[in-house]
Curated annotation (Swiss-Prot):
Gene from which this protein is expressed: mraZ
Principal cellular location given in the protein's record: cytoplasm
Task of the protein: Negatively regulates its own expression and that of the subsequent genes in the proximal part of the division and cell wall (dcw) gene cluster. Acts by binding directly to DNA. May also regulate the expression of genes outside the dcw cluster.
Keywords assigned by UniProt, alphabetized: Cytoplasm, DNA-binding, Repeat, Repressor, Transcription, Transcription regulation
Designated name of the protein: Transcriptional regulator MraZ
GO molecular function: DNA-binding transcription factor activity; transcription cis-regulatory region binding
Cross-referenced Gene3D superfamilies: Transcriptional regulator MraZ domain
The UniProt record lists the keyword Disulfide bond: no
Superkingdom of the organism of origin: Bacteria
Length: 152
């Protein structure tokens, strides 16, 4: 399971160094093989260990290519999917097209989200966190049943 938000640097070649605490888990679970794609709803990238991505691919394969909305999701997620191999130094090369899509600069937030990571431009991440907190504090919407049952 991946959790926490860590500031990492992209080098001049577009590689990011995976924090040490995740490297062993990624090497054991996927031999360092990962897949990166865009997020459909946020200005970030999604980085999956290969076995987790294969589950997503199976779900995507069950969507109908005849349904325009389902085809669009397939096109966006699969069309932007890029395989990444963690090297011996624990670095992952992110495709330039993906870095541009998420407006990633030198400073990137690597955010654990259970079975995957989100990759955010640092400033965009902090802005999103502020917006999310403000939204939660001012929301007049009733909580969903699942959130009502969540005890922290």
């Amino acid at each position: 399971m991946f959790r926490g938000a860590t500031l990492v640097n992209l080098d001049s070649k577009g590689r990011l160094a995976v924090p040490t605490r995740y490297r062993e888990m990624l090497n054991e679970g996927s031999q360092g093989q990962m897949v990166c794609t865009i997020d459909l709803h946020q200005p970030c990238l999604l980085l999956y260990p290969l076995p987790e991505w294969e589950i997503i691919e199976q779900k995507l394969s069950r969507l109908s290519s005849m349904n325009p909305a389902e085809r669009r999701v397939q096109r966006l997620l699969l069309g932007h999917a890029s395989e990444c191999q963690m090297d011996n130094a624990g670095r992952i090369l992110l495709a330039n097209t993906l870095r541009q899509q998420a407006s990633l600069s030198k400073q990137v937030m690597l955010v654990g989200q259970f079975n995957k990571f989100e990759l955010w431009d640092e400033q965009t991440w902090y802005q999103q966190v502020r917006e999310d907190i403000d939204e939660e504090r001012s929301s007049k919407q009733p909580l969903s049943e699942r959130l009502q049952d969540l005890s922290l």
